[in-house]
């Protein structure tokens, strides 16, 4: 896919298999500081009921890529009324049991697309990511928790 981690490559792929608390020995930065320093965050979720990490990325002006197998990806598609694109701040890729390589290729292409995006447009993409995060604030979601709570109570008391 062209991501080879050569010295001259503009994109470096790294795996950090630890929790980022600021003393990991690799970055030594707290999670949120590192998150804000990223140009793009990739979350190739195979299954996540919601997925807070893509939302956190958006809240810190970091556009992200996720899949429609995450609740967050499904929610973004619903809010936007179409499959999320890089320009929207959240790229949502279709994922199923048989398209692993296609998902990997689309994620790679999204990274390349962002690298080739002019600075002014990248700023707009970052702002769109924040706009999506703002739509997921508690002031918008709390009513659903109250509805679920009241539904649960009604089931208990109607038995």
What are these regions (language model features)?
Residues 44-127, 131-133, 151:
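Catalytic binding pocket for nucleotide-activated donors in carbohydrate/polymer assembly enzymes
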Residues 29, 36, 105-109, 139-143:
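A structural signal for well-ordered alpha-helical segments within the folded catalytic domains
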Residues 13-16, 34, 38, 90-93, ...:
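Generic structural hydrophobic/aromatic packing signal, biased to beta-strands
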Residues 1-33, 92:
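Nucleotide-activated donor-binding/catalytic signature segment of Leloir-type glycosyltransferases, i.e.
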């Amino acid at each position: 896919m062209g991501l080879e981690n050569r010295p001259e490559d503009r994109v470096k792929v790294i795996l950090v298999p630890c929790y980022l608390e600021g003393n990991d020995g690799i970055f030594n930065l707290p999670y949120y500081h590192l998150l804000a320093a990223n140009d793009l965050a990739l979350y190739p979720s195979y299954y996540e009921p919601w997925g807070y990490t893509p939302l956190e990325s958006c809240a810190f002006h970091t556009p992200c890529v996720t899949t429609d197998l995450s609740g967050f990806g499904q929610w973004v598609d619903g809010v936007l009324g179409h499959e999320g694109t890089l320009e929207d701040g959240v790229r949502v890729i279709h994922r199923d049991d048989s398209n692993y390589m296609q998902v990997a290729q689309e994620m790679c292409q999204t990274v390349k697309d962002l690298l080739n995006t002019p600075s002014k447009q990248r700023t707009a993409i970052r702002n769109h990511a924040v706009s999506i995060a703002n739509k997921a604030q508690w002031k918008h979601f709390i009513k659903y928790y109250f509805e679920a709570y009241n539904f649960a109570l009604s089931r208990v008391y109607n038995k």
